[in-house]
């Protein structure tokens, strides 16, 4: 079940459920600013506002660059709709027409709890991206246009997940959240696109990704490095017992007891 796979990803991100704004409810995430400095509309005084192609292209370039740099290619797409505003059949028709997507692999009715605690009827559409031809930039452009001249149904309603897990959520032309199961998973994105991080959240994000990590104690023997005691003990045992046997008073089991702190389980000279 794709819905179950999606929920497992959400749990892996440290959340019980999707809760907006996603960045504020996830332990590890980065919020990027997508819209650039160009004006959104060509002429704000016109009777009918016309979207500025340069603004749209700039936002698309940023969103697509981050998408291509994700830890892996997303393998699951979820798009939410709200049947109280538009019937589910009509929603799906619009989604398929604008995106060129096939019939979803799963369609699930649900109840959404919003930020104010109010409930809303919802329908969730799921696609297994590994089995279809998918044009991510077409989807990203539709989301970007949602609030500035496109179809608003894509705004804050599209989620892409992949192994890790991670979640990619372009919510509109202004911003994008990328959530991860660990800071190590998102560290390459943090470094590569640090200049695009939303300034309002920059200090908070920097604290997460630059915090000192506890250093693992390392051991070296015969030029080999070990990051855990078990591997180190195994190598010590190999080096110090090489060529010895119980006949000359060195029993490997007894030596292993002493080495690992478990004295008294074997006697020296006891055959192996």
PLM ranges: what are they?
Residues 1-150:
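Extended, low-hydrophobicity segments enriched in charged/polar residues
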Residues 85-89, 133-135, 167-169, 184-189, ...:
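Short, surface-exposed beta-strand/loop "edge" segments at domain boundaries and coil↔beta transitions
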Residues 150-164, 254-263:
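A short, acidic, amphipathic alpha-helical segment used as a generic capping/interface helix at domain edges
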């Amino acid at each position: 079940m794709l819905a179950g796979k999606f929920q497992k990803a959400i749990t892996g991100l440290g959340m019980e459920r999707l809760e907006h704004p996603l960045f504020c409810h996830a332990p590890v995430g980065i919020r990027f600013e997508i819209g650039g400095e160009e004006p959104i509309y060509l002429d704000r005084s016109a009777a009918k506002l016309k979207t500025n192609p340069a603004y749209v292209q700039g936002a698309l370039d940023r969103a697509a660059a981050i998408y291509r740099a994700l830890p892996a290619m997303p393998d699951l797409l979820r798009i939410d709709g709200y049947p109280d505003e538009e019937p589910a059949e009509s929603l799906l028709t619009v989604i398929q027409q604008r995106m060129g997507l096939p019939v979803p692999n799963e369609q699930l009715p649900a109840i959404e709890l919003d930020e104010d605690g109010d409930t809303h009827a919802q329908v969730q559409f799921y696609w297994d991206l590994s089995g279809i031809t998918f044009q991510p930039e077409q989807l990203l452009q539709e989301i970007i246009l949602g609030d500035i001249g496109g179809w608003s149904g894509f705004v804050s309603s599209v989620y892409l997940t992949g192994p890790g897990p991670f979640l990619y959520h372009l919510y509109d032309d202004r911003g994008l959240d990328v959530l991860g199961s660990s800071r190590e998973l998102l560290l390459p994105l943090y470094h590569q696109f640090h200049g695009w991080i939303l300034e309002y959240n920059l200090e908070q994000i920097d604290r997460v990704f630059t915090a000192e990590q506890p250093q693992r104690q390392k051991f070296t023997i015969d030029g080999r490095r070990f990051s855990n005691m078990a591997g180190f003990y195994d190598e010590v045992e190999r080096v110090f017992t090489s060529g010895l046997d119980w006949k000359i008073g060195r029993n490997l089991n007894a030596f292993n007891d002493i080495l690992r702190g478990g004295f008294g389980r074997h006697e020296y000279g006891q055959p192996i």
